[in-house]
């Protein structure tokens, strides 16, 4: 999408998108940026860039907006790839959001320097004298520069300024009814706009807020400075704006702190999701081990500073690339449910077999010379789910990276309470071994014996090959041909994404559609 021209009204509400999709410098390698851009549907790249930019918002709003879709060719790994990409975007949002917070703090300090305080205090004293008030304006002047105001204190000072304006003959409630405030939160979803007395003030302050998010170097514009005015309404409007920016900074600090904690805890949950994918492709053991180590480093850090999320993100992306190359379906919920069903059947857990009581449990492979028997409902027996490693000694049996997999199950429900029980799934290693045995044309017992006596890694043949020739296919190849490549929408230079109406449930969100980028 081309950048709006100077005359285009969308320019004031548009956010610049660079070739990196606004990922921060030094966060990702060019290879990983290209990987994410190629994986995400073209129609979602604008939203990715907007969220990457660090647009100030609450963490729950960020999570709600993270509806990133990967392209159809990556459907097999969608349930693992999309959470990894969303996590990466959240980290980018945190990094850029921290920079925006520093920019806002610096701009606020510049706009409320000693000279500005003195000018505002002098103006307030004139107002107080005109209204015969004995109050000291010092508290209000200091509150404008206070970046630790609570919501209650902020609202109290806003009401006080409203009362001063009303006493001067300026009814804020009446004057603000005809004003358009829709641009005030286009670039900042945390900003709580007070009521102002003129459209000029609203327009000027909205440009200031846009400059914060865009990290422009221009200082704040205020009515009293631009007009060189000592008029009470303009002084009070400026104080309202700076007071509200101070409160916004407090909210932004709290939001980034909550997001940082959420990202640390989410690293643990992501490890569980990726572990199921690892069991499907055991040859990714070394990569998953790095993912787990980096996640643990985040969780165990005691530093008050923001931890370094970059190594964890890089390890996850490298891991997911290997999962994609394995060409298997990674469906964590389905796999865990199937493991629970098989485990319940193996151990005779009454009430936990979930409909498998009358199902056929065992199948015999007639093509196997040992009349091998395998469980019908073992997901690792399906070559669309499990990629058998070439070297069994390094990846199967005791060499499998261990993690206790668990699954919750609703076991009782009354009018007052729902009770869940957490089941451990200790049979994962055994089920993986059975999947390997089937692919290697062995019985599970033979595989177990092989692993106990062989220590030298040897590639195991898993295809039906005789005399050096592969057996003819029994069935037709009905795989769908790859889709024709589509022209990428990103190009040289920069683009822009219009942010008006991007906020959830926005009243100005009209005519927005999500276009599929490929069939």
Swiss-Prot record:
Domain of life from the UniProt record: Viruses
A single GO cellular-component term on record: host cell nucleus
Role of this protein: Plays a role in the inhibition of host type I interferon production within the host nucleus. Targets specifically the NF-kappa-B-mediated interferon-beta transcription.
Disordered: annotated segments: 485-519
Localization (cell): Host nucleus
Record's compositionally biased regions (Basic residues): 510-519
One Pfam family cited in the UniProt record for this chain: Herpes_pp85
Biological source species: Murid herpesvirus 1 (strain K181) (MuHV-1)
Record protein name field: Protein M35
Keywords: Host nucleus
Principal localisation: host cell
InterPro entries: Herpes_pp85 (IPR006731)
């Amino acid at each position: 999408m081309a950048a709006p021209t100077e005359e285009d009204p969308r320019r004031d509400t548009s956010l610049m998108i660079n070739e990196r999709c606004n990922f921060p410098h030094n966060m990702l390698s060019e290879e990983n940026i290209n990987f994410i851009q190629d994986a995400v549907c073209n129609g979602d790249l604008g939203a990715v860039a907007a969220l990457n930019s660090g647009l100030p918002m609450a963490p729950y709003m960020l999570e709600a907006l993270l509806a990133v879709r990967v392209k159809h060719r990556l459907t097999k790994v969608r349930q693992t790839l999309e959470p990894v990409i969303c996590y990466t975007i959240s980290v980018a949002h945190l990094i850029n959001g921290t920079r925006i917070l520093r920019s806002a703090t610096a701009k606020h300090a510049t706009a409320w320097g000693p000279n500005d305080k003195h000018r505002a205090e002098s103006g307030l004293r004139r107002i107080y004298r005109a209204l015969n008030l004995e109050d000291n304006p010092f508290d209000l002047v200091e509150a404008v520069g206070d970046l630790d105001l609570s919501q209650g204190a902020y609202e109290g000072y806003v009401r006080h300024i409203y009362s001063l304006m009303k006493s001067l003959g300026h009814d804020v409630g009446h004057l603000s009814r005809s004003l358009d405030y829709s641009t005030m939160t286009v670039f900042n979803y945390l900003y709580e706009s007070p009521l102002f007395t003129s459209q000029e003030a609203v327009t000027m302050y909205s440009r200031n807020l846009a400059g914060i998010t865009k990290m422009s170097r221009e200082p704040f514009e205020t009515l009293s400075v631009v007009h060189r005015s000592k008029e009470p309404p303009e002084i009070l409007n400026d104080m309202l704006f700076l007071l509200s920016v101070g409160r916004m900074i407090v909210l932004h600090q709290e939001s980034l702190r909550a997001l940082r904690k959420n990202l640390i805890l989410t690293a643990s949950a992501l490890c569980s999701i990726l572990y199921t994918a690892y069991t499907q492709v055991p040859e990714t053991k070394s990569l998953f081990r790095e993912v787990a180590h980096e996640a643990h480093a985040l969780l165990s850090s005691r530093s008050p500073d923001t931890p370094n999320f970059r190594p964890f993100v890089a390890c996850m992306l490298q891991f997911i690339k290997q999962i994609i190359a394995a060409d298997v379906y990674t469906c964590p919920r389905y796999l865990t449910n199937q493991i629970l069903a098989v485990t319940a059947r193996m151990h005779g857990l009454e009430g936990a077999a979930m409909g498998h009581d009358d199902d056929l449990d065992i199948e015999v492979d007639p093509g196997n010379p040992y009349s091998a028997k395998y469980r019908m409902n073992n997901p690792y027996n399906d070559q669309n789910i499990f990629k058998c490693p070439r070297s069994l000694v390094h990846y199967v049996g005791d060499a499998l990276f261990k993690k206790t997999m668990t699954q919750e199950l609703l076991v009782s429900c009354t009018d007052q309470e729902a009770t869940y029980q957490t089941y451990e799934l200790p049979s994962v290693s055994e089920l993986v071994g059975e999947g390997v045995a089937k692919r290697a044309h062995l019985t599970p017992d033979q595989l177990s014996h092989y692993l106990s006596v062989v220590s030298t890694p040897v590639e195991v043949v898993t295809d039906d090959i005789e005399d050096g020739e592969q057996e003819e296919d029994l069935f037709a190849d009905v795989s769908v041909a790859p889709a024709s490549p589509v022209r990428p929408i990103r190009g040289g230079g920069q683009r822009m994404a219009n942010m008006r109406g991007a906020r959830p449930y926005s009243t100005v969100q009209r005519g927005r559609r999500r276009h599929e980028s490929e069939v």
